[in-house]
Amino acid sequence: MESFEKLETLLGYSFKNKELLIEALSHPSLRQYHEYKYDKDYERLEFLGDAVLNLLITEILFKNFENYKEGNLAKIRSYLVCKETICIVGTKLALKDYIIMTHGEEVAGGRDNPNNIENATEALIAAIYLDSNIEITHNIIEKLWAEFMKVQNLTDYDPKTALQEWAQANSHHLPIYRLIKREGAAHSSIFTVLVKVKDYEQTCTGYSIKEAEKKAARSLLHRLK
């Protein structure tokens, strides 16, 4: 496990209560490890962090996308708070190096498990919120999610719907998605998906079928336009 100093530097925030940070990075497998001196894991913080993230992302969108209607804002929010986006944020923070887990969980591929990274990211958001206030948490989320706010059109936020609309507008059958390959351990698999519209095909990979489908749809749309 790494020292927390680098993580706090990336966050731009230093915890006053380090036990909150430790709790946010403690995997549930530790419940079975009686020698671990902290009796809490990140699940409760994850629950709170999910709500805090949704609230603050909604507020950021409401203020920054003044000309967007509710339906479009909902699509963008769905993209910003989905598992894949949260995992990217957690990966850039290198959370896999900081999550505290049992040896058994680590051997089973726990450090590269997207679910663990997503859960720890949400728990970390809750820990920041409890250790500081809503304004500081807002600023940190705005910074961590900044690159995802730069997308210029809804195609990038909801590529599957956009591809379906393109197919209908051009009198083609609806897109067909097919799982081509699954590699890796059970809880850290990499999925390869193919999407086909008429004679056009695109293959992409992701940590979930849903992520791979979105990537494939987005890539195919960029080729078609």
From Swiss-Prot:
Catalytic activity reported: Endonucleolytic cleavage to 5'-phosphomonoester
Keywords recorded for this protein, A-Z: Cytoplasm, Endonuclease, Hydrolase, Magnesium, Metal-binding, mRNA processing, Nuclease, RNA-binding, rRNA processing, rRNA-binding, tRNA processing
EC number: 3.1.26.3
Lineage top rank: taxon: Bacteria
Family: Belongs to the ribonuclease III family.
Gene Ontology biological process terms from the UniProt entry: mRNA processing; regulation of gene expression; rRNA processing; tRNA processing
Organism whose genome encodes this protein: Rickettsia prowazekii (strain Madrid E)
Domain DRBM residues, every copy: 158-225
Active-site residues, Swiss-Prot/TrEMBL: 50, 122
GO cellular component: cytoplasm
Recorded name of the encoding gene: rnc
Protein localization: Cytoplasm
PROSITE patterns xref list: DS_RBD (PS50137), RNASE_3_1 (PS00517), RNASE_3_2 (PS50142)
Cofactor: Mg(2+)
Keyword presence, Kinase: no
Enzyme class label: hydrolase
Binding site for Mg(2+): 46, 119, 122
Keyword Disulfide bond: no
Span of domain RNase III: 4-133
UniProt GO MF annotations: double-stranded RNA binding; metal ion binding; ribonuclease III activity; rRNA binding
Complex and partners: Homodimer.
Principal location class: cytoplasm
Protein name: Ribonuclease 3
Known function: Digests double-stranded RNA. Involved in the processing of primary rRNA transcript to yield the immediate precursors to the large and small rRNAs (23S and 16S). Processes some mRNAs, and tRNAs when they are encoded in the rRNA operon. Processes pre-crRNA and tracrRNA of type II CRISPR loci if present in the organism.
Gene3D superfamilies xref list: 3.30.160.20, Ribonuclease III domain
